[in-house]
């Protein structure tokens, strides 16, 4: 397999046909067709189905596509790093940050990082799994800060940072804000963030392991911390979130954690990166700045900083 063949496959997937792929790549249609035909002949498999409206990937093409994307991304990264050595382009670091950490620790971490490596171009995403995992796999994101318990170990490496408690959250006006058991909350509507595994693991963790069953239509999935928080505060839904979210706007001062008899799960925030992608100097510096910020919270004079430190058990 050659790079130009994989680029042709990716362009067809993006554009939906040979003509669009040629336009994306700046090549002739004949050149794109030739590259794809050579790739199919080498693999002994049909990778495309041509039709009147363009072309679509076969099952074999769909299997090859993510590998092609990763190979192209890694080559681009190698080209960037070599260009950095030549002084032609600035270094770049892309990080996904879980929402509660973004609101409580990101500012101090970024200040320290900018002082240490001011020439690095930093890009930050709100790092819910639905956003971070595809970017990590493509090589466009270098590391993510978030829960790693359900991630495949053969694909990702994770460095634990801190353990925290999960909590059931309700607004101060919620009619069941004084509930003492999950059994009292089965007829209420909930909002949760699901990882790549869907809602089933969360439902088991929160309800089923305690002997309760809840209708899944009562659970709204929110892939945005802003939407999740708004639905708890403004729509009167119950939430299941990391305890540090209580320190984050708009939940701070408007919600409370329910004091339930059932023990809720602990979770862990980790540094996550691809197993086959080593961390460079910028990534390692960012991690060190974050670890320093975490440790500093326990020594801070700020009551809010000490409150966060009390919610966390450091794991490094």
Model feature map: region roles:
Residues 40-62:
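A short LG(V/I)-centered, amphipathic sequence patch enriched
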Residues 90-152:
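Central regulatory/effector-binding core of bacterial HTH transcription factors
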Residues 42-43, 64-86, 286:
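Alpha-helical linker/hinge and terminal dimerization helices associated
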Residues 105, 176, 226, 256-300:
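A late-sequence structural motif
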Residues 10-31:
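Short helix-boundary/capping micro-motifs
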Residues 156-191, 195:
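Flexible hinge/capping segments at coil-to-helix
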Residues 128-141, 147, 196-258, 308-316:
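Hydrophobic hinge/microswitch elements
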Residues 147, 176, 188-211, 243, ...:
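Secondary-structure junction motif
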